[in-house]
Amino acid sequence: MIDADPKTRDSIWQGVSLALAALADPRVLDAVTPGPNEPFDPETFLTQQGTLYLLATGAGAGASAALVAAFVEDLIETARRLAARLPGARLDPPLLLALDEIGNLAPLPSLPMLMAEGGGTGITTMPVLQSLAQARDRWSEHQAGAIWDASIAKIILGGASNSRDLQDLSTLIGERDEYTNSVTLGDRGTRSNQRSIRRVSILPPDRIRTLPFGTGVTLLRSTPPIVTDLRAWPDRSDAAQLRSDRTELEALLRRPAP
């Protein structure tokens, strides 16, 4: 590395410095530095079926996005190595990556490939994105398309405003037959009935945009679209426990750093 071409070396070090820039913040460094009795081994974490929560805001994650992405990528690579040693090359039980707002927090470089290949190794990936436009901005046009195409189940919510994407979704959902009956009266009182058929969108773009809160459209493999009623978390049977956990976590986040 020291003897490498100066231009190549500078380019590599620039990437390294950007990836590790978050560690210049003492708060970030303290958060990722384990104590004497706090080791973290990715393989042990996965084999013991651990659960890890990475919480951040869009503004707060900006400086540490590369560090968070590197951490998640390390877990994914460890999961792949574990899967390769198991029968059928699949993790059992599988690993769930619930990536809510991943486009804002830490866009994973490997997400397109993970969506395409992860399911075969027992890695279930569930990215939650604000829009297809956001995916194109965070990855690229081609990679955003790969993420969309590789999604086995797609849940579409209302509120989108990109006319191109809304029209594409309407086309993907499909069309239905619309029947129109007409009556024609002749000069001599004759009467004729006629029925015509035309193809119309099942859900026009404006209907998709105005889907009410709590309603989504599910596209599952090659099945017809499913209008889905989504259950809000306060209506779940474990809502009381979730409220208690949220209160406890918020108190922990407000606690002053030592």
Predicted feature descriptions by range:
Residues Q49, M113-A116, A135-P258:
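P-loop NTPase motor core of the ASCE superfamily
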Residues L99, L129-Q130, G158-G159:
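Short beta->alpha connector loops at strand-helix junctions that form conserved
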Residues G118-R138:
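Sensor-1/coupling segment of RecA-like P-loop NTPase cores
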Residues M1-I123, D206-V227, P234-S237, Q241-P258:
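P-loop NTPase motor domains
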